[in-house]
A protein has these predicted regions:
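Nucleotide/pyrophosphate-binding catalytic subdomain
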Residues: 1-261, 274, 281-282
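Membrane-helix cytosolic exit motif
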Residues: 253, 266-267
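Charged catalytic cores and adjacent phosphate/nucleic-acid-binding surfaces used
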Residues: 267, 276-278
Length: 282
């Protein structure tokens, strides 16, 4: 394999890449992508290139994408007011239709970009290859769900065929209706079900910061719990850390909160000694 023709010039060092390829050879990596990575054209193109590289060097990955900002844009265009309860978007009959539309449009855009780079990908959504069955979160939230069952067999079949599934964070309820799912939670549930080696949560921040606002490159479960208890981890980072802790407690060997604003952050996280965020493990 001619790595120098596959790894971008501004990517990680080729010697380091070789070492890490062996490490992940028979493992599965789950990558959740959201935030500005999906909106900033330059970051989006680098994300597409990173996923394409993973496929070309023969590693197995699953991508779950968010789309909160795309959803907001779609709702604003249609004059629909967004309400949140405990950080979750209230999704009534009308809202869920636009949420589905925004997420499926984004999914198609990601697929088309990856296919243009000869990447072997497939779409996973309730309309096509559904793999997530949900339980409704609460009556007041409407069509918002939590994963109840993940179709592991279907996902592993795609991986066996050397495809990278691109997952829309939507699932089906027992009522046959489509429900919106928090993308971090969807990625965490899939990672647990398939015993992923790594779960990468791409964000718009550097990683987990200590009390002096300095980046922590690695923490264990106990320290993360302590930081939550002492409010060192706060705000939007709390649900992300809870997803990380849940995944690690259920078989995922390591979860990384990745700074998605860094060039080729996925490649640097997986294939360099330095990484690109905060690694959390037992």
């Amino acid at each position: 394999m001619e790595l120098d023709k596959i790894i971008p010039a501004d990517g990680p060092n080729i010697n380091e890449v070789e070492k890490y390829i062996n490490k992940y050879q028979s493992e599965v990596i789950v990558i959740k992508c959201g935030g500005s990575v999906l909106l900033d054209k330059k970051l989006f193109n680098q994300f597409i290139e990173d996923i394409s590289v993973i496929n070309k060097i023969g590693l197995s990955a699953i991508v779950v994408h968010g789309g909160g900002k795309n959803i907001k844009k779609k709702l604003d265009e249609n004059n629909i007011e967004t309400r949140f309860i405990k950080g979750l978007r209230v999704s009534d009959d009308k809202t869920i239709r636009y949420i589905e539309e925004a997420l499926l449009d984004l999914n198609l855009e990601i697929l088309n970009e990856l296919k243009s780079k000869n990447t072997n990908v497939c779409s996973i959504s309730p309309k096509e290859n559904n793999v997530i069955n949900i339980i409704p979160e609460s009556k007041e939230l409407g069509y918002v769900g939590t994963p109840k069952k993940i179709n592991k067999e279907k996902i592993l079949n795609f991986i066996k065929n050397k495809q990278i599934p691109i997952v829309v964070p939507l699932g089906l309820g027992d009522d046959g209706r489509i429900y919106n799912i928090n993308a971090d939670v969807a990625a965490g549930s899939i990672a647990k079900e398939i015993d992923a080696r790594r779960l990468l949560l791409m964000t718009d921040v550097e990683g987990v910061l200590d009390e002096n606002q300095k980046l922590i490159s690695e923490i264990n479960l106990n320290r993360a719990n302590e930081m939550l208890k002492n409010n060192i981890i706060s705000g939007g980072m709390i649900p992300k850390i809870n997803t990380c802790l849940d995944a690690i407690s259920n078989g995922v060997r390591g979860v990384v909160i990745v700074d998605g604003r860094k060039p080729h952050s996925i490649l640097f996280e997986l294939f360099s000694d330095k990484g690109a965020g905060t690694l959390i493990r037992k």
